[in-house]
Swiss-Prot record:
Native organism: Methanopyrus kandleri (strain AV19 / DSM 6324 / JCM 9639 / NBRC 100938)
Binding site for substrate: R85, R91, N123, R154
Residues noted as binding NADP(+) in the record, renumbered to the chain: G8, A9, T10, G11, R12, V13, G14, N98, V121, T122, N123
Protein's name in the database: Malate dehydrogenase
Gene Ontology molecular function: any one: L-malate dehydrogenase (NADP+) activity
Protein's gene: mdh
Biological role stated in the UniProt entry: Catalyzes the reversible oxidation of malate to oxaloacetate.
EC number annotated for this UniProt entry: 1.1.1.299
Superkingdom per UniProt: Archaea
Alphabetical list of NCBIfam families matching this protein: PRK06223.1 (NF004863)
PANTHER family referenced in this protein's UniProt entry, alphabetically: L-2-HYDROXYCARBOXYLATE DEHYDROGENASE (NAD(P)(+)) (PTHR43128), L-LACTATE DEHYDROGENASE (PTHR43128:SF16)
One annotated GO biological process: lactate metabolic process
Enzyme class, UniProt record, top EC level: oxidoreductase
Catalytic activity entry: (S)-malate + NADP(+) = oxaloacetate + NADPH + H(+); (S)-malate + NAD(+) = oxaloacetate + NADH + H(+)
Amino acid sequence: MSKVAVIGATGRVGSTAAARLALLDCVNEVTLIARPKSVDKLRGLRRDILDSLAAAQKDAEITIGCERDDYVDADVIVMTAGIPRKPGQTRLDLTKDNAAIIKKYLEGVAEENPEAIVLVVTNPVDVLTYVALKVSGLPKNRVIGLGTHLDSMRFKVLIAKHFNVHMSEVHTRIIGEHGDTMVPVISSTSVGGIPVTRMPGWEDFDVEEAVREVKEAGQRIIETWGGSQFGPAQAITNLVRTILQDERRVLTVSAYLDGEIDGIRDVCIGVPARLGREGVLEIVPIELEEDEMRAFRRSVKVVKEATREAMEAISER
C-alpha cells in the first residue's frame, strides 16, 4: 500500500484527483497539500473525501499539510499547484511563474526521498517536467509529466465515434508538446487491429479538424466551465494506478529523452513510455513517417526554447 501526496489539492484538478486517488485499492494514504492560507479549505476537502470513502466503503487515511515534511516521504508526489490558464492564454504563457512554484516545492526532493516518483500536471507540463527533473535531483525515470496522455484519449474518442466502434478498439497516440505543436501519429493508428487508413470511411475523417478539436478542448472548457477538472483528474488516477500496481502499460506521457527517438536529447516531451513501479521503465521507440518526424522535431524545438527560458528564470530567483 502506498502514500500519494497531491500538491495544490485545493484547486480544481488537485481536489478531484485527490478524491479519485483515495478510492484506489493500491493507495492507503492521500496527503492534501496547499499554502498555509488555504488550511481551512484543506480541512473541508479532507472531510468531504472521507465522506466519499465512507459511501464507497473504502478505508484510507486522508491527511493535510502545508510543509515539506508532510509530502516529501510520499511514494508518488502529484504536482498540480500553479497559476491556471485564463481565457486567451496559451499554456506556455504560464512558464516562468509556474517554474518558480515547481522549484519551491520540489527542489532537492531526492536528498530526502530518492525513491519518490513525481508526476507533474502543472502547465506547461513538458517544460515543467524538465524543471522538476533538474531541481528535484531525481533520476530521469522518476519524474513524469501528464503530457499528451489526455490529448491521446481525446483523439481516441473522436476516432471511435467516427468509425462507430468502442474506444478499446482504437489504438492511437498524440506525441510532442501538450499544446499547439502536438503531433497525431496516424501511421501507427489502428481500429480493431486494422490500420486506420484502410478503414472504410477513412477518407471522410478530417484529421486536421480532429486535432484542432483536441488542441482547443482545454480552452473551450476554460471559457465555459472555468477550467479542466475531471478529465485531468482521471488521467492522473490512471497513471498513478499504472505506476503503483506495476502494470507496465505503454502510455503517452512527458518523459526525458536521451536519444531514444531519432537521437533527440535533453528535453521532456510527450512520447510513448512503459510505466511501472520504478516510473518510466522504457521509452518505447516509435517509427514515424517523414512528415510526422518533422512535426515532432518542430514540437521539440518549441518545448526546448520554452524550457531554456524557464531554467533561466528560476536561476535568477
